[in-house]
Amino acid sequence: MQNSQDYFYAQNRCQQQQAPSTLRTVTMAEFRRVPLPPMAEVPMLSTQNSMGSSASASASSLEMWEKDLEERLNSIDHDMNNNKFGSGELKSMFNQGKVEEMDF
């Protein structure tokens, strides 16, 4: 007579033999690496700063970025003040407190 451990292994072998007939095949999608689209490099991470590891180089790059940002914000303010797309009227209505009179 076989011991219980041998019987357990015999059952497992039978299940393993039956398993391939009951399995389904699943097709998996294949993913490939693709290059990233070209993007503008952030001024703080530019190659010029990585070559010169001084803090002043990165600070000047940051200052240039902030100056450019300030110029763009000033340009937006200028456009708003010159009534581009009616925003000048909207701003004056808000400043005068005539929000209730506004017709949307």
From Swiss-Prot:
This is Ribonucleotide reductase inhibitor protein SML1. Present with 18800 molecules/cell in log phase SD medium. Keywords: Acetylation, Cell cycle, Cytoplasm, Disulfide bond, DNA damage, DNA replication inhibitor, Nucleus, Phosphoprotein, Ubl conjugation. The modification Phosphoserine is found at S56, S58, S60. Residues 43-62 are annotated as: Disordered. Homodimer; disulfide-linked. Interacts with RNR1. Strong inhibitor of ribonucleotide reductase (RNR1) and is involved in regulating dNTP production. It is found in: Nucleus; Cytoplasm. The modification N-acetylmethionine is found at M1. GO terms for molecular function: ribonucleoside-diphosphate reductase inhibitor activity. It comes from the Eukaryota.
